[in-house]
Amino acid sequence: KGLDIKLKGSAAKELVPVNSSKSYALVPDDFVGVTPKVVVAEGQHVKAGEALFVDKKHPEVKFVSPVSGNVAAVNRGARRKVMGIVVTPDAKQEFVEFGVKSVHSLNGEQVKQALLSSGMFAFLRQRPYDVVANPNDKPKAIFISGFDSAPLAPNYDFTLDGMKNELQLGVNALAKLTDGKVHIGIHKDNASKVFKDVRGAEVHVFDGPHPAGNVGVQIHHIDPINKGEVVWVVNPHDVVAIGKAFCKGVISFERPVVLVGSEVIKPLYYKSYFGASISNMVKGNVKEGANVRYIS
């Protein structure tokens, strides 16, 4: 059961570099279940990988700057709710160095501490509720959906091309966090070159229309969550970023962004960074006068 909605404006498989954004922002609402405590002040200089805010309930879970630069604004809304922290990037980037670590030689607790110290733990989601994972929990399994069945969704085989080693290292790290299995879902109509040869994970082949790519659907069919149990889910690009953090010793916020839709002049994949403004991507590439709504 399901439905594939055929929308106009799919992207060509072309990855285009985009000029550096004039500002980058971390938005607490993107991290469901977190009550942010800001740990920087406006005007303060931060390195890429340095904490901008932490979770009040679990202060060991920190949310770090994607770039080095000056904190331009701590935007607040009603009742002083933190709406976003904006960083103006340096011309030359500086990174917090966490040190190269061998995943093979680490135990689960050491891997978790490495993810917490680097800020990568913030990208682990917990089911039920799809909130940021609780570091005190032990998931019964970890799930990665290797395809997105939503309309105009990015093709992971394309965006992850050439990242097989980092993906494998990320899977190796995640496997240390659970006594169960790491599960990867792929679609039968997709060759899934990136995922099918991953070691240390159980690969499952799915068939059918959307929402087959939703990780919740895959959990339901592979290892349903019973009362009192939790599983963790991770986006494939975040798995790669975890792998890079261990093999390079610095956090990587490089992410592909796909600009698609019927009002886009030339739908493309852009090589960008987490938290970047989309202004450089949409400028001159969206039909003028169109009543456009941007959906992320």
Where are these regions (language model features)?
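Short, well-structured beta-strand-loop connectors
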Residues: V40-V54, A73
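N-terminal, Lys/Arg-enriched amphipathic/low-complexity engagement segments
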Residues: K1-V39, V54, F206
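Short, compositionally biased leader-like segments
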Residues: V38-A41, K227
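Short, charged beta-turn/beta-strand-edge "cap" motif at the junction between a beta-strand
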Residues: A51-E60, A78
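Buried, small/hydrophobic-residue-enriched core segments of structured protein domains
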Residues: V61, N75-S296
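Short coil-to-beta-strand transition motifs
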Residues: E60-S68
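Short, solvent-exposed loop/turn positions at domain surfaces
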Residues: V34, V40, K57-E60, K266
